[in-house]
Amino acid sequence: MISEQQLDRRTLYMSTRTNESKKEPKKETPAFPDEIEHLDDIRNKLEDAIKKADDSVERIDKEYMDSKRYMVQYRGEIDPHEMFQNELALKQINNRGVFAVQNRDKLFKMLDSPYFARIDFLEVSQRTPDSFYIGRFAFSYEDELLIFDWRSPIAGLFYDCKIGPAGYDAPAGRITGELTRKRQFKIKNCYMEYALESSVNIQDDILQRELSNTSDEKMKSIIATIQQEQNRIIRNEMSEILIIQGVAGSGKTSVALHRIAYLIYRFKDRLSAKNVAILSPNKVFGDYISNVLPELGEEQIYEMSFEDIAREQLEGIIHIEAGKNSLEVNDPEWEERVSFKSTFTFLKMMDEYLSKITETVFEPSDYTFGGFIAESNWIQNRFEAYYNYPVKQRLQRIADDIYDRFENCNFMDEPLPKPRNILKSLTAMLKVKNALALYKDFYKHMNIADKFVMPAKSTLEWADVYPFIYFCSAFNGLQENQEIRHLIIDEMQDYTPVQYAVINALFKCQKTILGDYGQIVNTNHLHTLNDLRELYKGAEFIELNRSYRSTYEIITFAKSIQNVVSLQPVERHGDTPSIIYCRNEQEQIATIMKEIIAFQNSKNVTLGIILKTNSAAKALYDVLSQSFEVHLITTESTSFKSGISITSIQMSKGLEFDEVIIPSVNNETFFSKYDSSLLYIACTRAMHRLVLTYTGGLSKLINT
């Protein structure tokens, strides 16, 4: 039931705690004496709760093993009914054990950092204010709630309100009063590193400290520094479709994941992690964000890509050509096809064609069996009546209708046709026999035959995959995913209107859609944010314009390359980005190596070397891997690691690094308006330090 690894966790953790306690706690900022005393009290109560939780785990484990041993020992003597009851009891014991282990693990996590804030709130009906401590999880001791979950209604006061009149929405209704105190803490290893009195939402000093930390191989929770505009998104319960347009570094992905944690907490009776999925651009990004929800006490959600969905829908139907990188393909006709199919106009053309599918695909004739007849015009009317159904499902329903009609008229008890034979006859009346034939006819009918090319027999170009699935939906129907009740779509700017149309057919659920239309990496995608808003006319639309990732100097530099007017940097200062001229390629490699050595001697944890294309990244990796331990991030990669990573701009989207090096920033590599967008993306991956190297002439996109 409970693994040895889980049972050993307490020993390992307490050993770590003992070692940490030998270290002197940081004395960065003198804490309030009352807060030191309170933290000591909470620590003692947590350690006592852990001991009790540990005892509970061991007791349940013993109970489970005793019951299991009894069932094995007396298996031959126990009647089936008693065996069933014993197995049921064993399952219940196991469930209690799982819950006990989860509770103990939660307490272990709390012991490191029990809470991060305190608020004092005086309700209108009270004479003295109550103090509330806010943490990652709630904690009760002897029936007294000592720490409140960051998602609880009362915690909204910390994120949204300043000192003074305030209120929050509780299950019982609106609670009003006065917020009299706000304190923020940094607690590590259950020691107070600092405590600050605050009158505003999130003390800038704490935000600066947290943003100045080094990056890691996993995205972290941001519960201690959630900003007011982010909190409004996280606690949004009503929006069926929520679109978040967020600039680079605005925390949009983290906010979306925190929103899921909040919704699971708020609607735990009907929503769990099993009912949530995220559509992410690649496996590396999925791995990078995989720690956020577990860190918040929730299970990891299901992660998938558009490629995964396509292969699942088209398995055994047709093959899919490997996707091409628009930056590395020189094929004007292919580029024209891809661009055309990325537009909202293309989706409208498909809808126009499919609206006339009745006359396109079906030419009924009379159906007779013995003395029974279903006239062609009656069949046609039934086909039109089922316009909301795919073609194949229409035929199935008509076959059932014909059988029912014949049966109702069968006064002489004559033999009737089998429904499957009726369906076979109806299928023969189709002018178009399958979805692929229908898709080909669309191009012919709309006089755009040159826009459809099959690279090989029974193989589709990637740009045709989702349009074809859309036609499959109209002809065969798609299997809707009923289990997913909330879908997150990240990097929304990378997906075409047709892809969204298919997703809407597959996932008829609540959606959080996020991205940045200033970070499009596919040169052939012509769709816009307005197109997306047209697709989701009733959606709530929110913009996040403040960037928290990069220093003021890095953001200012990035804005000089691509002037994103709405982008607002945080006042966190650092070094000005370095632009280094190299006389030749050998000197550029030597310069990059020198920067790597400087990184290795620094306190920074992650370095990203970002090139324009995947092939350029691979070429540099082949050189640098002979001298350094480096990781190459490609489309086949599945994880993000700390240390030195080499990748393309396309693969770096959504990731962040302490330091970034961008090689070959010359006129030959970066010269077009589109290249300015790529450079902007690469620059905004850097948190603390940015270096650009070049040979020949410096790109004119950079204003020095």
Regions from the PLM with identified roles:
Residues A256-L257:
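Post-Walker A alpha-helix
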Residues I264-L487, D494-V502, Q510:
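Alpha-helical nucleic-acid-binding subdomain
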Residues D269-R270, K274, K283-N291, E295-E299, ...:
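Conserved helicase motor core of SF1/SF2 NTP-dependent helicases
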Residues M238-L242:
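Pre-Walker A (Motif I) flank of P-loop NTPase domains
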Residues K252-T253:
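Conserved lysine of the Walker
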Residues M1-I223, Q227, N231-R235, S699:
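Extended, charged low-complexity regulatory segments
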Residues I244-G246:
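Hydrophobic anchor at the beta1->P-loop junction of P-loop NTPases
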Residues G249:
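Walker A (P-loop) phosphate-binding loop of P-loop NTPases
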